[in-house]
């Protein structure tokens, strides 16, 4: 069974004005997401599932889904604030979505096969889809608790325009994930990659340190674990009272690896990540995509 690609398209970038998922950056107005989908199809993925906000549906169908019809089957699902487990009610004042893992949970009814999860506004590169596609396609029928994450080398994921947030990964000798620690301020200073640690000190880390760019591989059992843990998350009064609390994928993954329920293999990739974190990054992304097209990595027109 071919794996599915699950695309997180419900969030709007807080730093970069407007819907960056729809920004045309390729030579024929291609979005970053177009390149991800092109790479995924070539890596053996068989279906796309997009999670979006309901009020964005018409725009999304017209501008996005129509492009891929005839190339790969597509499903559209919705992330809503009030889509909570029985017994829980969303605070009336809350406007922020419940986070990336809540978005993933929306796929439970339409995904019965191994699947990868990506952000729509990150350029992950061909090799990262190849390594994830290979991992998911090799899983035996009915596999459970055997997950993966593409580990980008931190030096390949920085922005020239400012600091970035990354999940810094700890791994063991078997390349299994042992921890993901979100660091919100990472940049290159005097040639070294540094981040601000819990004590407010700048700390150096090697260029090759694996980081999570939210490119995960799961099997469908992940949905049931998420549902149970989300109930525990919502049962904590501080998560309900904090209108900006979020149920992130690393939070869920961290729990499953710490209690020994699942393993997460960190897949190394040579791909260089890029994306538009800040408006000033846009031109650099346009130039990088053009360079890949000029080098023959991608056709000038994808679909």
Residue ranges and their predicted role:
Residues 1-10, 27-117, 124-131, 137-138:
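Conserved N-terminal catalytic core of the sugar/cofactor nucleotidyltransferase
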Residues 12, 122, 154:
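Active-site metal-binding loops of divalent metal-dependent hydrolases
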Residues 18-19:
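Conserved catalytic-core motifs of eukaryotic protein kinase domains, centered on the activation segment
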Residues 59-60, 225, 252, 284:
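Phosphate- and divalent-cation-binding pockets in alpha/beta enzyme and binding domains
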Residues 126-215, 220:
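Conserved core of the sugar-phosphate nucleotidyltransferase
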Residues 210, 265-271:
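Catalytic beta-strand/loop signature of glycosyltransferases that borders the donor
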Residues 226-262:
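A C-terminal functional module that forms or caps the active site or interfaces directly
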């Amino acid at each position: 069974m071919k794996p599915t690609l699950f695309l997180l398209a419900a969030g709007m970038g807080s730093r970069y004005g407007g819907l960056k998922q729809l920004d045309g950056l390729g030579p024929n107005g291609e979005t970053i997401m177009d390149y991800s989908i092109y790479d995924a199809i070539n890596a053996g993925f068989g279906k796309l599932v997009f999670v979006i906000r309901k009020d964005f549906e018409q725009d999304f169908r017209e501008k996005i889904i129509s492009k891929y019809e005839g190339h790969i089957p597509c499903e559209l699902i919705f992330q809503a604030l009030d889509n909570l487990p029985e017994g829980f009610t969303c605070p009336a004042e809350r406007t922020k979505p419940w986070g990336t893992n809540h978005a993933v949970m929306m796929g439970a009814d339409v995904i019965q096969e191994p699947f990868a999860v990506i952000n729509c506004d990150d350029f992950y590169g061909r090799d990262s889809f190849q390594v994830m596609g290979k991992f998911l396609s090799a899983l035996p029928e009915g596999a459970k608790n055997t997950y993966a994450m593409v580990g980008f080398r931190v030096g390949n994921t920085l922005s020239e325009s400012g600091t970035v947030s990354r999940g810094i990964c700890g791994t063991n000798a078997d390349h299994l994930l042992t921890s993901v620690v979100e660091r919100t301020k990472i940049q290159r200073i005097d040639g070294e990659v540094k981040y601000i640690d819990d004590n407010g000190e700048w700390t150096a880390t090697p260029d090759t340190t694996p980081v999570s760019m939210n490119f995960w591989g799961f099997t469908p059992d992940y949905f049931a674990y998420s549902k149970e843990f989300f109930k525990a998350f919502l049962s904590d009064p501080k998560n309900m009272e904090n209108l900006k609390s979020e149920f992130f994928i690393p939070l869920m993954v961290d729990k499953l690896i710490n209690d020994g329920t699942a393993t997460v293999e960190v897949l190394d990739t040579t791909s260089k990540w890029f994306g538009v974190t800040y408006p000033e990054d846009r031109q650099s992304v346009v130039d990088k995509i053009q360079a890949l097209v000029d080098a023959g990595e991608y056709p000038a027109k994808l679909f």
